[in-house]
């Protein structure tokens, strides 16, 4: 175990906070519940942003920006929406030394301000579909906060789309869910379950919500992304109508969807270890760190440094994200540990022996410290690419193996009962696949007795036959296979 961070097994929460602070991802701000995202943490968010932004544009979305100050009356127009968010509102009642005629709410989410504008912009079927994304901050007055996972203010993207038909809006909702799934699995190397939320767990103001659920190393679930089908709810609340091809006036159908800096928390909790942060290569701000191993002689050090610069130049020319650590005051061991703590995927060591042999020594962040070998400069680019690709795949497979190991099926039978289910969730946690009758009462009782919620009705198990299956709690006829878990 590192001297610098808590043991993951002994104190998971402190281990997580140690990595956040000591890897310089974020720090606490003077405002309770808020965080300062430090440059290294923000560089991860910037990478997430750039990849997703490209994917949104490829699917026909444009970026815009809407005010963070929302008239309170806008939020009152959609009853379920205000009921769901009002406990978290931050409200401004005074400004400029005077009381405001109407209170303003700091943006908890932007459906209302955006749909107010859509009522001005959408008049004809020619204006549809309208597909806008916004990169912004939001404020939700959370009582229990933790950096990246749940903070009073956080960064996110939120997409808001308007469509002529219900089919188009539903297609958009599921399209974006798939974009998120592919991004989280392919770039963050986090295996996920996708599925529909229960009525209790859906977004306030949505007809239906679809979520992406991941399993952290402490066996708690984390909601990594959501996509909502809003139906006509916001179009009716803000009277957004269009004239169709037959000249009839009709309300538009809607979707909204988003991910946030919570994804950085997921990266930490899925991949990191007691040496610090572990970042999948495709999302790492720095893919490769070159560390010259200096000697006492200046002449030798100059040769090592010149050679190291050539290595860096070759890697940059091949478009790798690479940095060099030229710190002559710190020992190689200290610099190795520093690179490990930051989660840099590949470390290249350059000593005088490497210079003489025209080689470098390569090691990987996700491997044991004994894993290292020399490669010739001629094969540098190909070998680095191979190791980066392998690390990306290995991290995903390791996380998938962990999820498989910690996903248990418990159904009512002669062997298992609700008591079996309850004991397992309370003692062990992880994902539990079970059956549910659809009753809110059963859902509430299970949550109260186990602290586990229905994470989603998973797509992976839609094809399974429910014939003869009964609700894990009440033994009534089952309507759904569902995933239960304790969660963040």
Curated annotation (Swiss-Prot):
Record field: catalytic activity: tRNA(Pro) + L-proline + ATP = L-prolyl-tRNA(Pro) + AMP + diphosphate
Gene Ontology molecular functions: ATP binding; proline-tRNA ligase activity
Record's GO cellular component terms: aminoacyl-tRNA synthetase multienzyme complex; cytoplasm
Domain of life: Bacteria
InterPro entries (alphabetical): aa-tRNA-synt_IIb, aa-tRNA-synth_II, aa-tRNA-synth_II/BPL/LPL, Anticodon-bd, Anticodon-bd_dom_sf, Pro-tRNA-ligase_IIa, Pro-tRNA-ligase_IIa_arc-type, Pro-tRNA_ligase_II_C
Broadest EC class assigned to this enzyme: ligase
GO annotation terms (biological process): prolyl-tRNA aminoacylation
Enzyme Commission (EC) number: 6.1.1.15
Role noted for this protein: Catalyzes the attachment of proline to tRNA(Pro) in a two-step reaction: proline is first activated by ATP to form Pro-AMP and then transferred to the acceptor end of tRNA(Pro). Can inadvertently accommodate and process cysteine.
Name assigned to this protein: Proline--tRNA ligase
Species annotation: Borreliella burgdorferi (strain ATCC 35210 / DSM 4680 / CIP 102532 / B31) (Borrelia burgdorferi)
């Amino acid at each position: 175990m590192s001297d610098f961070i808590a043991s993951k097994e002994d104190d998971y929460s402190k281990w997580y906070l140690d990595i956040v602070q000591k890897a310089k991802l974020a720090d606490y701000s003077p405002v309770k519940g808020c965080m300062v995202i430090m440059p290294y943490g923000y560089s991860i968010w910037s990478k997430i942003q750039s990849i997703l932004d490209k994917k949104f544009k490829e699917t026909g979305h444009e970026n815009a920006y809407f005010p963070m100050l929302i008239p309170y009356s806008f939020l009152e127009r959609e009853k379920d929406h205000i009921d769901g968010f009002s406990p978290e509102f931050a409200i401004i009642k005074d400004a400029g030394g005077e009381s405001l005629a109407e209170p303003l709410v700091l943006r908890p989410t932007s459906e209302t301000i955006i749909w107010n504008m859509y009522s001005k912009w959408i008049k004809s079927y020619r204006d549809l579909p309208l597909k806008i994304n916004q990169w912004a901050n939001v404020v939700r007055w959370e009582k229990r906060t933790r950096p990246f996972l749940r903070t009073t203010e956080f960064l996110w993207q939120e997409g808001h789309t308007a469509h002529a038909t219900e089919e188009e809006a539903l297609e958009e909702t599921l399209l974006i869910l798939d974009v998120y799934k592919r991004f989280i699995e392919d770039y963050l190397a986090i295996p996920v379950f996708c599925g529909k939320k229960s009525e209790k767990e859906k977004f306030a103001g949505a007809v239906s919500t679809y979520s992406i659920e991941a399993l952290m190393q402490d066996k708690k679930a984390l909601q990594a992304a959501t996509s909502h089908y809003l139906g006509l709810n916001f179009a009716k609340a803000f009277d957004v109508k269009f004239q169709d091809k037959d000249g009839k006036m009709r309300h538009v159908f809607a979707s909204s969807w988003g991910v946030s800096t919570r994804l950085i928390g997921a990266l930490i909790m899925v991949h990191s270890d007691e040496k610090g942060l572990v970042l999948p290569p495709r999302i790492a701000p720095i893919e490769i760190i070159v560390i010259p191993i200096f000697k006492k002689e200046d002449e030798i050090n100059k040769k090592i440094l010149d050679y190291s610069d050539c290595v860096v130049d070759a890697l940059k020319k091949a478009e790798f994200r690479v940095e060099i650590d030229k710190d002559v005051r710190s020992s190689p061991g200290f610099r190795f540990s520093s690179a490990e703590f930051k989660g840099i995927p590949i470390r290249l060591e350059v000593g005088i022996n490497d210079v003489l042999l025209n080689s470098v020594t390569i090691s990987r962040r996700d491997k044991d410290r004994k894993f290292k070998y020399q490669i010739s400069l001629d094969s540098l680019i190909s070998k680095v690419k191979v190791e980066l690709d392998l690390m990306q795949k290995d991290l995903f497979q390791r996380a998938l193996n962990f999820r498989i190991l910690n996903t248990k099926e418990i159904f009512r039978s002669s062997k298992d009962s609700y008591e079996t289910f309850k004991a397992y969730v309370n003692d062990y946690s992880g994902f539990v696949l079970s059956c549910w009758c659809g009753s809110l009462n059963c859902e509430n009782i299970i949550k109260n007795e186990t602290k586990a919620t229905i994470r989603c009705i998973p797509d992976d198990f839609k094809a399974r036959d429910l014939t003869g299956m009964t609700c894990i709690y009440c033994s009534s006829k089952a309507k759904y296979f569902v995933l239960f878990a304790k969660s963040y």
